[in-house]
Amino acid sequence: MSEYVEVFRVEAKSLLKNFQKHEKEAVARCERVFGDRQDLSLMNMQHVVAKEYGFDSWNELVKAERWQLAEALIATKNKTLHTPLSVDGRKGAMYPFADGKGTVGLRREREGVDLVNFQRIYANGSTSPYLPLDAMDLSQYDLSKLNVLRADYDDYTLWPVEAAKRPEGFEPAEFLEKRKNPGLGIRALHKQGIDGRNRAAAVIEGFLLCDHLEYHDNLKWYERVDSGEPRHGVSGGELVSALAGKTCGVAPKADIYYFSALQTENKQRTQRYYAQALEKICDLHEERLKEGKSGIDVVCILWGIVSELFQNDDGAAEMQAAVKRAADLGIWVNSGHLDFAGNKLWRESRVRCKADGDLDNPDDYTVMPNQLDMAKFPELVRNTLCFPGGGRTVAGSVRLDAYRFSAPGFSLKPYECGLFVLARSVKPDLTAEEFWRIGLETGDFRDGIGVIVNPRQLVTALRG
C-alpha cells in the first residue's frame, strides 16, 4: 500500500470527527455523497474523501499508483500542498509526519542582516555570492537593490507586497514561470516533435524526490545503490527536471533511469557505488534493445568522476571498467569537464540569461560569475562550447508541486545531456565527439564568452 494512502486516511478520520460534531462544512461534504444520512461510519468517510479527490471509490484510491495519489492531492488542493508530509530520502518519497502537523515552515532572517550585499561563508572558509531564500518570509525587507540572479528562492518565498521594495519590474511568480524555459530555441524543437520521445537517459546522483509532478511521468526506474547511510541533497530533482521535466526539461518526453548513490563511505571518497550504478545502467540499456526500444543515450553525472584527479579513489578501477563498457555500448558517460585531446581543461562553460533578457537570444547571455574569465584566454574561446548552466527554474526538492529558481545552477550537464538525446532523435548513431564538433561549428560565437550552443542549427546540420 502506498505511503500516501495514510494522508487520505487521516483526512477521513478528521472528517468523521467533524461530522459527529455536526460542523457545517463536514455535514455538507457528506451530504453531497450520502444525502441526509446520519449513520455514517469511517468507511463512509473514506468513500467521501475518495470521491472528492477524483476516485470512484476508496478501493480505487487504495489501488492507485503512488504518483496518481500525489497528483490527486495537488490537483484537488489547487497547488496548496501544505499536507503533513516529510521527505524520506531512502525511498525518494514523502511520508506523513508522526504528529500530523506538517506545514510549510517559513523562515525569517534576523533583523539587520544585509540581504543585498551578501556573501555566504562556508565552514572551510570558501565563499559564495549566492543567497539562499527558499521558503523565507522576506515581506518586511527592502529588496529593491537585490540582484535576482544571485539568489535561490521558490514559490513559497514571501516577497514584499510593495513593488517599490522589490527589484524594478520583478514579479516573482512570473519570473519563476518564465525561467522554466530551457532557452536557446529548445521549445521550438519541441514544437517540431523533437522532444526526446522514444529515447532514454540515466542520472547518477544523490537524493531524488521521485513523485514530483514535473518529472514523475518520465521516471521509469529509481534505485538506491549504496551502503544505506543517511543522505540528503537538492541536486537530483534539479538535474532530472532540467534534463527531462515536462515544463523545465530539454528533452521532456525522454525516459529517465535514476540511481541514487553515495560518493563517500566512512568519510572516504568512493567510486564503488557509482560503478555499480553504471553497470546496472548498461544492463538496462541492453534490456531496452532486446525489447525493440532505443537504448540509453547518455548518463548524466555531476561529479567529474572520470577525471585523473580521482584515479586513486576506492572503486576507481571498477568505475573505469564500467565507463569502458558503456562506451562500447554507445552510451555517453557525461561526467565533469570533457577531456578531449588538445583541450583538456576548458572545453565547456556555463552561461546564463540576463534578468530581463530573451531566453532564446544568445546575445542576452553572459558567462556565469564562477566560470573562467575567457577574455584572458582568447586561444580557448573558439574551442569552448557554452550551455545554459544557471538562472533557471527547476523542480523543488521537498514538495511535490514546488519549483525553485536556482541561481548557481547545476543545469549545464542536464542541458548537454538533454540536447544530446534530442540530437540522437535525429541521428541515432551520433557520438559525443561528433556532437561536440558540430556544436562548435553551428553555435553562436561571442567574443570573451565562447561558442554558445545553437540547438536548432545543430539539429539542422545533423539532418544533413
Where does each model-flagged region fall?
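Protease zymogen maturation seam
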Residues: 83-198, 213, 460-463
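N-terminal domain-start motif of subtilase-like serine proteases
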Residues: 171-201, 224-229, 285, 363-370, ...
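Subtilisin-like serine protease catalytic core
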Residues: 187-223, 227-274, 292-296, 378-381, ...
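Extracellular S/T/G-rich loop segment that most often corresponds to the catalytic His/Ser-adjacent loop
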Residues: 205, 328-331, 336-425, 429
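Caspase-like cysteine protease fold
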Residues: 447-464
